[in-house]
């Protein structure tokens, strides 16, 4: 038929959708998985011996910045997608803080069309407020209709509770996820570095964990009140993990993301790496890091995302107070999950795969990829 058949032999299939974790063969017919089983053979197929390797569904990163449109000297949809594919990600969701903002259907369509030129699924979240100004709600109906993956003003907190309440009610009615960057500027003297031992040492204002905690508490209660599917983005504070845990027990449809930098690094990284370790919210203390890992262990935190946020070398070469916040992550995320979570025994490989594939897909209303059952996207990663 001219279709390229690939037979992956002896790989450990780890599928968070079905719970299958066993050594099996996988036959790929061009673009889809034809058969999964034992002792498979196929005439003319290219055979890959995957002994000692893992075969899993494509990874899903629901929090990336591809800087496109408007800041493509940092990254663009094509380079971002290449980094994603290299890291094992077959689907990403881009944030809306581009220039112009993705607060209208035209800009959304631009990203979708450029995304189709890549080898992965590039989805785009829409802003909650026009121009990310936090004052006027976007046309959520039109953006949902046009295929927005969800709604978020990521990068900026929504201080206007009335606006957020209306947005949550609309998100609930649309059954669309609403994702929130939680940093109250009242408690942020200088962004990007935790307020504490290191910020004092560097004579830098810093961002207090209270900035996150007060917003997370408010928005967990708004989520409980509205019933909206809400995601607390890139959680960084031990107290915030506990607040989400409590809200889940109360019955809120609230979810939380952790990034590799927040479960691997602490504020000491700023001394070692300078501006490269500057991000919003900042990496904090060892206690915060361990509480984030506990949150991943018990399911309080159910998504692992990169918050892949590239900048130019020139920008990061500026002094700490002037350099932009953000760190890249697509090519290192899986490795850090394996090294920092699975190898020390904090999570099983199955739990890691759920956090990096099934859970983010389901929260963003996609059908999660599976190796062992029929799914529209059965791309596998070795």
Language model features with spans:
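Histidine-rich, glycine-flanked metal-binding segment
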Residues: 4-58
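Metal-associated gating/positioning segment near the N- to mid-region
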Residues: 51-115
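Histidine/acidic residue-rich metal-binding segments in metalloenzymes
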Residues: 137-304
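His/Asp/Glu-enriched, well-ordered alpha-helical/loop segment
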Residues: 201-229, 276, 297, 302-304, ...
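Conserved small/polar residues in nucleotide/adenosyl-binding loops
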Residues: 381
